[in-house]
Amino acid sequence: MHAKGLTAADLASYGISDVTEIVHNPDYDLLFKEETAPGLQGYERGTVTSLGAVAVDTGIFTGRSPKDKYLVRDDTTRDTVWWSDQGKGKNDNRPLSPEVWQHLKGLVTRQLSNKRLFVVDAYCGANPDSRLKVRFITEVAWQAHFVKNMFIRPEADELAGFEPDFIVMNGAKCTNPQWQAQGLNSENFVAFNLTERIQLIGGTWYGGEMKKGMFSIMNYLLPLKGIASMHCSANVGEQGDVAIFFGLSGTGKTTLSTDPKRRLIGDDEHGWDDDGVFNFEGGCYAKTIKLSADAEPDIYGAITRDALLENVTVRADGSVDFDDGSKTENTRVSYPIYHIKNIVKPVSKAGAAKKVIFLTADAFGVLPPVSRLTADQTQYHFLSGFTAKLAGTERGVTEPTPTFSACFGAAFLTLHPTQYAEVLVRRMQAAGAQAYLVNTGWNGSGKRISIKDTRAIIDAILNGDIDRVETFTLPIFNLAVPIELPGVNPAILDPRDTYANREQWQEKAQDLAQRFITNFDKYTDTPAGAALVHAGPRR
C-alpha cells in the first residue's frame, strides 16, 4: 500500500534534510525483506523464527523509560496538563522548556537527515470523528513494522490525501549529550510538543514508546471533548453486550479479553463516546513470557508471518523459547488485530459497555479474586488503580512491588486523574454499567490465582451469574464477595481461607488498607475526592 506524493521537500518541512530515499507505507512483504536483510547489524537486525514471525532485540530498553518522558510547557499545555511538579500526585509529565525542545528536535532531525527513511501513515482511533492521523518517521525497518501492526492501517484512498495531525520522529540511534546541563534525567528522551504536534524519541529502541506516546496524546485530547479515554481492553458478546477490562501491564487485559466466546474490540487502549466503545489501535501488543498454545491459544496462534516478537530467545533451529526471561520478563509480540479470528469487523468499535472490570494483581495476597463494587467504590478503586508492578514492564523493576496507578494507567495520563474518573462515571451511569474488582494476582497460598479460575470468574460476570448469588462482606475493605461461583474453586473466594490462620490475613489486610488510605489522601483536596474516602478500606 503506497501513498503518493511524499517527497524529500515534505520531510524538509519537519527539519529532516537530504533524505536519500523514502520508503513510504511499505507493505508487509517489503518490511519482512527489509528487517531481515543480511547486512543489518545490531538492533536493526531481525531473525526469522520457525513460527514465521520476525524476532528483534531492543537492547537495554526492554520496557518504557517513564523518567525520560517530557512535555513542552507552553501556552497550550500550561493550564491543562497534570504536571509532575504541581499538586500532590506524582506522575511522569515532566515539563520541558521550548528551548530544550528545539535542541532535542535538532538532534533527532540531524539523525534522520541524509538517510534512507521509512515513513508509515496510520490512524490512532477507530472513530473518524476523533481519530488522529499520525505520520511515523524512522530509519529502522522493524520500527516501521511495529507501527504498521499497532495502529489502524488506512485504505488506499485514505492514504492518497493523508495530511498528518501528529508526527512521530524516532531517532533511536541518537542521544542527548547535554542532558545534565539541561536538567534532564538521562541522555535518552521521549518528548512531546502539543503545539507543534510532534513526538521525538532518542536513545531508546523500545517500540512501545511509539504506541504509548500516542496513547498519552489521545489521553490529552479526548477527555477535553467529554470522551472517555481508557487504558483497557474490550470485547463484545453475541447479544451486543460490551465489557471493558482495566488494568496495568501484565494484569491480564489481553489474555482475558481474548475469549473464543466473544469478539475482541481491542486489547489495550479505547475511547467511549456517544456511539459506544472504540479501539485506538489496529493491533495487539501481548506479553509472551511463559506463553503456551494450551493456555492462550488465540495469542499463540497469532504469532505467524507479520507478527513481530521482541526480546524473546530464539534457538538455533529458529524455535522460540517463551519460558526464557533472561533478556527481560517483558517479552512481547505485536500483531495486526486480524491475526485474532474472533474480532469485531469491519471497524473495531461497538456499543456502550455494560460490564466494567478492574483487574489488579495483588502482591499482598489480601484482595478477593472478585468483588462487586458500589458506585462510590467504583470511583474509589478507579482513582486508586492498585496493582503490583510486574517484573520487566519498566526498566529497573525485577520483583513484583505494590503500586497505585490512577485510572489503572497513571503513566499515560496527561490530565488530572479526576477528569478521567468523572468522564468514565458519566458514561457508566448513562449506560447503566456495573463495575467489578478482579484480583488476578496472589493469595495466602503464595501462588498466583489460576487462569482457569479467573476465566470462570469473568464468565460469571459476563453472563450475570455473579449478580444472582449470595455475597458476604469482606471486613476492612468492605467488599461484596460471592459465596460461590460456577467453575471457581470455592476455597479461594474468601482470601482469609487461603492462609494458615485468619490473623495472618488480618495483619496483611491492615497493612494494605493503610497504603490505600495514604495513597488516596492526594485526592482529598477536592470535594469529590473527599466524599469518596468512605468507599475505601478502613483499618
Swiss-Prot record:
It comes from Edwardsiella ictaluri (strain 93-146). ATP binds at residues 212, 231, 247-255, 296, 332, 448-449, 454. Keywords: ATP-binding, Cytoplasm, Decarboxylase, Gluconeogenesis, Lyase, Manganese, Metal-binding, Nucleotide-binding. It catalyses: oxaloacetate + ATP = phosphoenolpyruvate + ADP + CO2. This is Phosphoenolpyruvate carboxykinase (ATP). Substrate binds at R64, Y206, K212, R332. It is found in: Cytoplasm. Involved in the gluconeogenesis. Catalyzes the conversion of oxaloacetate (OAA) to phosphoenolpyruvate (PEP) through direct phosphoryl transfer between the nucleoside triphosphate and OAA. GO terms for cellular component: cytosol. The keyword Cell wall biogenesis/degradation does not apply. HAMAP family: PEPCK_ATP. CDD domains: PEPCK_ATP (cd00484). Its cofactor is Mn(2+). Its main location: cytoplasm. Pathway: Carbohydrate biosynthesis; gluconeogenesis. Binds 1 Mn(2+) ion per subunit. GO terms for biological process: gluconeogenesis. The keyword Manganese applies. Belongs to the phosphoenolpyruvate carboxykinase (ATP) family. Disulfide bonds: none annotated. Its EC number is 4.1.1.49. Monomer. Mn(2+) binds at K212, H231, D268. GO terms for molecular function: ATP binding; metal ion binding; phosphoenolpyruvate carboxykinase (ATP) activity.
